[in-house]
């Protein structure tokens, strides 16, 4: 069990285990620990079990579960004995439990290692699911959550006995990761599962989570029937508008208006209540007044509705009240197994020919296409839909997320990955709920389909506005790191969002950054070339063969170097032929075509030539036509649309956003390195002792509070690094001049003498550092001066002088939303001034490390810039990887700064370290927690 990790004490009800989970059919269930008052419910549960299910659970036929057994099952201490129950629609439908084996060594009490499972206890485990709920994944998800709770309580392995003919239970155990070990003499099969996190176990959990999320969204985006609640009979009412949009859009399913005040809506008979609707309802779109929401959601649950889209406002303008009301609404929906979009959303759209659903307030939805779009801002989302339609950019589906109380961007990303109608995904975000989960999901999805994201609130004023709208704030550097690692294309403006999306939706990805430019005005070509270079693209040299072919193709003679100027007399045929030749040049990865009127032929004729040349190209073609209107129908028709840009800078910028994504897709993801020399136990002991000790000079939060935050003294910080194999200069901690001299002799002259004061960012600023001390007399004098200046009781640290090399800084910060963030930059006294830094989320792959090291403005200093010495990049990368691993293993490390880390040809070594630790409450491992959104 990790230091600082404190599950509920034995006998105390563990409220932290309560959560909502998604099942394989897309519905949800509530999980919680069993309580003594569950005895009547458990008795009713047992009465509904079939004879076969009872036999398989208890290995003997019986008619019912006795009162003594019931009392035993509901009486647990939540530590050595724990049971979780699943509740659906107020009824207990499944139970899973463990009992710690009495003959196991007391691993948890001895400080077992949860990461490896060593020194942990065994526990017997069993579960049973009510017959009418079997096959929904309840047993699997209960075991996953029970395993998570068990690890936190010092359990390292589950053991279970199963009858050979109980193939369903055996399959559930196998799906979770149990291994069959033996057929016992009693005729039962013994299965076991190690609870230490294993890649295959995490992969199984993610796979089940993925399937459940996709199926849950199908109720919302692929419904066979839709009830519009409070449809209203008057024109202009939101409900009536949605009914009208469903009908006018040709929705292929049943439209069911529900309004007690209306006899008919848009020519359809209206039902007085949901219970009056004959047949099943897949989706309910709710537009009632806020005060009626809970009653309507409850009625939907009783009817068995699959999903909800809540257009109504969830609460008042008070943010705290709104969040509380949203939580209550979601909890009510989850009690009936329903997913919920909203509240305060603008609806959902699916243009798939088999669905044709416009269950939104959008009067003019975009045409069918291959772009999926979600927006946290309802009004902005509807406006962008209209602009997409005006640009001829088709949409596969659209979801207005509103308050994002339940269904989130994470759910939609997983659905759209599997959606055959979607090629490009666009998300507009105002806040993150679970950014680490978003990162995991986006990294997988972006390998198959590009994700274009706009995250608002980048500036201080923007963050104030986001807060007033209920959107959370996180460091913008962290968001950049998240998007970069996950392959998400981040854009800064709405115009850029539309332009990049249009490029991705119509053109192939570039193979590199080499751009060719063809136009009929030299000035425009130069502007385009400048823009390309400024955005990190390369205006490439054309091959001699291409230049020869160009000279032959245009008889009047043109400049055949890149950018190519065809002059203002260029005809459509000349454009077409030149474009075809340039696109065949292997040195060219992308082509930007410019046109400036007037010319012998109009813009439409030139556009037709561009469209024809681009129709069979395997490289992206972008068109910059400086014309008074943007109709250019030729660019929008034909087998492949050509994206049009009003200005050359816009075309260059859009291409520059896409090129890094193409590189990301084409390179290896890398691996998360493993290390077999870590002393995790020693590291945890250092942290535990610091947090359990008496308040000292390095205490940040008063010890009277429930949480503690403490700066490690220098010796403890150095020992923590040593436990994780992070190179640190030899050191000796001393408290007198005599000890300082002895320490200097042991590490070797010349030495540095430093004040042991980790709360100080730069000890040199207060005169706390002496360097290049070459003799015992110099060391003694420096030590006396420091001890006199800073008073009795202080300690000093003696180290040899560091090697020559490049000073870098490696940092670590535990962000409450993003988790651990690793920072790399150029260090020393100038670190804050230069601000040449990059951030990365953990876990970090080898590719993430390479990008950190090579992505800084000053990175050439590491690779021999202007004759400087080469640096051992692998050694520097290993330091970063080890820091990332420490961040994963020891989440109590809230802040760390290794400044400087000197990188040289011989490797990388830290000269100093500041480490702050704090008590934390750990979130359980990877689990299906539907209430945690992003």
Model-derived features: where do they sit?
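Catalytic-core regions of core metabolic enzymes
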Residues: 198-934
């Amino acid at each position: 069990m990790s230091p600082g990790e404190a599950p509920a004490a034995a006998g105390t009800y563990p409220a932290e285990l309560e959560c909502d989970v998604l099942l394989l059919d897309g519905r949800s269930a509530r999980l919680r620990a069993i309580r003594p008052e569950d005895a009547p419910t458990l008795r009713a549960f047992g009465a509904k079990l079939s004879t076969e299910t009872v036999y398989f659970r208890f290995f003997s036929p019986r008619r019912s579960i006795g009162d003594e057994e019931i009392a035993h099952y509901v009486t647990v201490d939540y530590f050595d004995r724990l049971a979780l129950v699943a509740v659906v629609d107020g009824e207990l439908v499944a139970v899973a439990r463990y009992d710690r084996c009495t003959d196991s060594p007391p691993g948890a009490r001895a400080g077992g290692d949860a990461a490896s499972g060593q020194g942990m206890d065994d526990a017997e485990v069993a579960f049973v699911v009510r017959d009418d709920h079997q096959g929904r994944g309840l047993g699997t998800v209960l075991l996953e959550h029970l395993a998570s709770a068990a690890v936190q309580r010092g359990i390292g392995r589950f053991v279970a006995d199963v009858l050979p003919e109980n193939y369903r239970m055996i399959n559930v155990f196998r799906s979770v990761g149990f291994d069959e070990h033996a057929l016992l003499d009693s005729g039962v099969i013994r299965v076991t599962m190690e609870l230490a996190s294993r890649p295959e176990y995490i992969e199984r959990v993610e796979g089940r989570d993925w399937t459940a999320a996709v199926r849950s969204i199908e109720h919302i985006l692929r419904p066979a029937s839709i009830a519009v609640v409070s449809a209203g009979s008057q024109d202009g009412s939101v409900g009536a508008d949605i009914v009208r949009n469903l009908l006018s859009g040709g929705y292929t399913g049943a439209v069911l208006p529900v309004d007690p005040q209306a006899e008919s809506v848009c020519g359809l008979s209206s039902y007085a209540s949901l219970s009056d609707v004959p047949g099943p309802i897949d989706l309910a779109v709710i537009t009632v007044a806020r005060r009626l929401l809970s009653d309507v959601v409850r009625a939907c649950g009783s009817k068995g509705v699959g999903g909800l889209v809540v257009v109504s406002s969830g609460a008042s303008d008070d943010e705290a009240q709104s969040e509380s009301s949203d939580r209550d609404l979601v909890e009510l929906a989850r009690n009936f197994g329903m997913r919920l979009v909203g509240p305060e959303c603008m609806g959902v759209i699916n243009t798939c020919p088999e669905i044709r659903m416009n269950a939104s307030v959008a009067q003019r939805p975009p045409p069918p296409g291959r772009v999926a779009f979600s927006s946290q801002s309802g009004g902005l989302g509807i406006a962008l839909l209209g602009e997409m339609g005006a640009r001829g950019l088709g949409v596969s589906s659209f979801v207005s997320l509103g308050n994002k109380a339940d269904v989130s961007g994470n759910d939609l990303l997983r659905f759209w990955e599997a959606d055959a109608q979607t090629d490009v995904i666009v998300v507009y975000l105002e806040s993150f709920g679970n950014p680490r989960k978003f990162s995991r999901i986006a990294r997988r999805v972006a390998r198959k389909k590009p994700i274009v994201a706009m995250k608002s609130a980048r500036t201080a004023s923007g963050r104030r506005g986001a807060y007033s709208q209920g959107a959370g704030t996180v460091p913008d550097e962290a968001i950049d790191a998240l998007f970069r690692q996950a392959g998400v294309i981040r854009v800064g403006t709405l115009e850029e969002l539309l332009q990049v999306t249009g490029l991705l939706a119509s053109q192939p990805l570039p193979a590199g950054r080499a751009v060719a430019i063809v136009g009929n005005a030299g000035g425009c070509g130069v502007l385009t070339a400048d823009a390309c270079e400024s955005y990190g693209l390369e205006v490439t040299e054309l091959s001699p063969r291409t230049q020869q072919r160009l000279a032959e193709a245009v008889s009047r003679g043109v400049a055949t170097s890149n950018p190519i100027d065809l002059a203002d007399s260029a005809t459509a045929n000349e454009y077409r032929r030149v474009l075809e030749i340039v696109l065949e040049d292997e040195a060219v990865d992308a082509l930007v075509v410019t046109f400036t009127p007037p010319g012998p032929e109009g813009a439409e004729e030139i556009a037709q030539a561009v469209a024809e040349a681009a129709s069979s190209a395997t490289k992206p073609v972008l068109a910059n036509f400086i014309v008074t209107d943007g109709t250019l129908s030729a660019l929008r028709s034909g087998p492949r649309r050509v994206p049009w840009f009003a200005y050359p800078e816009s075309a260059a910028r859009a291409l520059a956003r896409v090129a890094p994504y193409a590189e990301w897709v084409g390179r290896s993801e890398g691996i998360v390195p493993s290390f077999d020399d870590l002393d995790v136990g020693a590291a945890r002991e250092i942290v535990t002792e610091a947090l359990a000790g008496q308040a000292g000079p390095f205490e940040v939060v008063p010890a009277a509070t429930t949480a503690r935050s403490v700066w490690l003294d220098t010796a403890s910080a150095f020992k923590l690094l040593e436990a994780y194999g992070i190179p640190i200069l030899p050191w000796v901690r001393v408290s007198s001049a005599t000890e300082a001299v002895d320490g200097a002799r042991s590490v070797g002259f010349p030495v540095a003498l430093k004040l042991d004061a980790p709360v100080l960012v730069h000890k040199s600023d207060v005169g706390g550092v002496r360097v290049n001390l070459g003799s015992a007399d110099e060391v003694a004098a420096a030590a006396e001066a420091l001890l006199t200046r800073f008073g009795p009781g202080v300690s000093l640290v003696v180290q040899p002088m560091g090697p020559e090399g490049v000073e870098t800084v490696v940092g670590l910060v535990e962000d409450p939303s993003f988790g651990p963030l690793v920072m790399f930059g150029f260090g020393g006294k100038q670190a804050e001034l230069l601000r040449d830094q990059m951030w990365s989320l953990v876990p970090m792959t080898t590719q993430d490390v390479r990008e950190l090291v090579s992505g800084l403005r000053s990175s050439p200093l590491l690779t021999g810039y202007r004759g400087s010495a080469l640096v051992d990049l692998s050694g520097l990368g290993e330091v970063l990887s080890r820091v990332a691993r420490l961040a994963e293993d020891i989440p109590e490390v809230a802040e760390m700064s290794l400044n400087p880390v000197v990188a040289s040809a011989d490797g990388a070594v830290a000269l100093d370290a500041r480490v702050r630790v704090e008590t934390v409450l750990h979130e359980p491992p990877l689990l299906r927690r539907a209430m945690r959104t992003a």
